[in-house]
């Protein structure tokens, strides 16, 4: 029996919408990353982008458990000596919740060209409104 390898022209992409309100950030992000990779499909192939598009709404209402809002830091570096910038997640979620969610998903995807291609299929919005109604997205039920 031969192993099945998905080809780019055989892949049918769907659009899903996920409501992140009141759900833990890591749990939602891990399931979104799985759908972006295509691991929910029987034709999943690790080196081919078989994933679907995902729209995340209410990104500002995502939960962080424990004391993570105050203790966990969002870090980036300017590449200059002493250029480490740290922002508590409470402040980052108030200013740019879309970025916080996108970074959580990005870190769960493969590093490299394929991961960047997968991340382009993620659309994150603040609030319940999004501009992808024309794609007729289905509601994605989260497992937990």
Swiss-Prot record:
GO terms for cellular component: cytosolic large ribosomal subunit. One of its GO terms (molecular function) is mRNA binding. Pfam families: Ribosomal_L13. Transmembrane segments: none annotated. CDD domains: Ribosomal_L13 (cd00392). The keyword Transport does not apply. Gene3D superfamilies: Ribosomal protein L13. NCBIfam families: rplM_bact. This protein is one of the early assembly proteins of the 50S ribosomal subunit, although it is not seen to bind rRNA by itself. It is important during the early stages of 50S assembly. This is Large ribosomal subunit protein uL13. It comes from Clostridium kluyveri (strain ATCC 8527 / DSM 555 / NBRC 12016 / NCIMB 10680 / K1). The gene is rplM.
